[in-house]
């Protein structure tokens, strides 16, 4: 006797078009935060009277913050609600855009860019939300491809728009544009997506988040400093790497003790876990 399982039906356009609009708007908002500013860096130097190194540091701060927030926000979304977390991310990112837009100096700009980094895990969170609402495998694969392709770049339009805005209205107009899109994303995600959580929602492992964030932050900063080669402060690189190792050691020990770990120790002991993480880390470091 054979049994057949029917594949879930595809969503109708009236259902998936609003959903995709909301998710793509959120992805657009993050992508603009990441790439739209690149053509405006020289303009920022002139208007703020800053050096190339200072402006470059603000970019590094954004991407480092994005990486750190990506460690725990998707998991937090599993526990308290993915839509709630994504809406909060977009709202905070919009606030960061406003701070950056009105920044009188590089120090305030740096703070604004760090706040904007909260949007870092936008894409994985959007893909999880998409999976929760699109149950048909074929349709999900197609829509997933659309979302991830947008994250790879908006056909160069983001860079061209950033260059045009900075050239005609100053670099602050770029941040105001980002803020508007983040605000639109807040409304779209709240209206057009459904709330979802994991099947089980235990307490968030904040004890594990802290040492892991410190460890990864130190390692990323060390790699960034080492990338300067002859101009690098190698003593600082060594200190940061040592702190990173200590942070990972603390994270390992915390995860062995908590009831609901951020990453189960059983996974940390598997070679395939470290092979995947190492490959990803080295690849992105090369980029």
Where does each model-flagged region fall?
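12-transmembrane solute porter fold
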Residues: 13-33, 37-41, 52, 56-61, ...
């Amino acid at each position: 006797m054979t049994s057949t399982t029917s594949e879930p039906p595809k969503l109708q356009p009236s259902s998936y078009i609003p959903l995709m609009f909301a998710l793509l708007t959120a992805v657009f908002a993050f992508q603009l935060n990441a790439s739209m500013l690149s053509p405006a860096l020289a303009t920022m130097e002139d208007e703020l009277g800053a050096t190339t190194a200072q402006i470059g540091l603000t970019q590094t701060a954004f991407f480092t913050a994005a990486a750190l927030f990506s460690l725990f926000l998707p998991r937090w979304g599993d526990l308290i609600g993915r839509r709630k977390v994504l809406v909060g991310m977009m709202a905070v990112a919009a606030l960061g855009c406003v701070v950056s837009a009105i920044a009188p100096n590089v120090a305030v700009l740096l703070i604004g860019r760090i706040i904007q980094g909260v949007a870092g895990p936008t894409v994985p969170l959007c893909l999880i939300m998409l999976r929760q609402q699109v149950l048909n495998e074929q349709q999900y694969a197609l829509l997933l491809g659309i979302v991830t392709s947008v994250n790879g770049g908006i056909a160069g339009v983001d860079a061209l728009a950033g260059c045009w805005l900075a050239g005609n209205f100053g670099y602050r107009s770029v941040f105001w544009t980002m803020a508007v899109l983040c605000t639109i994303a807040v409304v779209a995600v709240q209206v057009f997506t459904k709330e979802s959580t994991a099947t089980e929602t235990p307490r968030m492992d904040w004890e594990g988040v802290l040492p892991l964030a410190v460890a990864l932050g130190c390692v990323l900063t060390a790699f960034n400093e080492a990338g300067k080669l002859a101009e690098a402060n190698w003593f600082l690189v060594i200190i940061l790497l040592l702190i990173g190792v200590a942070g990972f050691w603390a994270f390992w020990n915390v995860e062995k003790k908590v009831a609901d770990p951020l990453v189960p120790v059983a996974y940390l002991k598997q070679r395939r876990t470290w092979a995947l993480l190492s490959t990803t880390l080295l690849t992105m470091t090369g980029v």
